[in-house]
Amino acid sequence: MKKLFYGILISAGLISSSLLFAQDTEELEVKGKVLQSDQVTAFKTPVPVLNVPQSVSIITDDEIMMKGYRELGDIVRYTPGVNTTQGEGHRDAIVFRGVRSTANFYIDGARDDVQYYRSLYNIEQVEVIKGANALLFGRDARGGLINRVTKKPMIGESFRSVNAGFDSFGAYDIAFDSNMDVSDDSAIRLMLHSDTLENDRDHFDGDRLGLNVRYRTEINADSTLDLSYELVDHERFIDRGIPTSLTSYYPDSKFDDVVFGSPGINLQTTEADIFSA
């Protein structure tokens, strides 16, 4: 009888403590400009986060602006569960939970496996999905994937913004974003980006130019049409770094002027005209 009585008291105490904990829990507020506060767009149709069987990290436009991210690799460095590698000096190479990939990149749910470094000037949101998902994205997605959501024209709004930055090595970047109404049911958005690349290595340099023009019109209450043209023009020196044997034998030496390759020949160029609808 005493054991039964003690069991009832313990159960009552657990219930009352859980109720007290529930009352003290503060409501979680999602801050930042998230396109879908509880949805992921990497699956081409919006999917609630609760229905995604992987771990998801969403990086918003506000966070990109606040932290000064210039390219996709900057986001990866500050996202748990993924990290970036050298990529042979000419492409994004991400490690998803120990699985390295140069192809698991998507833009608005469509595959983007071109070998280059991806800028963020026309990106509204980045979704990092960690965990195997070969059923939807193929066998390459055994570790995870990254989806970028592009900025779209906003009907009924007009705004312009200019952002610029520079670093101590002499590199700079500038971005222009303008949204204009064309009519009551359509809008156009112009985004322009230019930057230069510099670091502590003497022969590392490059420049990138991006232009993206987007048009949106409302066909009816349930349908919209988006048209996009993007110009990509990238050129950079392929710097593969210094062999570890040199740093092992000469740990106190500087190798800023040592380069393995020809600065005038070892260049990576990306030129593309991209149309989408």
Model feature map: region roles:
Residues 11-12:
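Repetitive helical segments and hydrophobic/amphipathic motifs
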Residues 62, 110, 165, 195-197, ...:
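Short strand-loop junctions, especially beta-strand C-caps/beta-turns
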Residues 26-157:
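Acidic, small-polar-rich N-terminal luminal/periplasmic segments of exported/outer-membrane proteins
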Residues 122-124, 135-211, 219-223, 273-275:
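Outer-membrane beta-barrel translocator/receptor signature
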Residues 58, 66-70, 169, 206, ...:
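Soluble non-cytosolic domains of exported or imported proteins
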Residues 1-8:
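Bacterial N-terminal signal peptides that target proteins for export
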Residues 195-199, 212-218, 222-276:
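Acidic/polar loop-and-plug regions of large Gram-negative outer-membrane beta-barrel proteins
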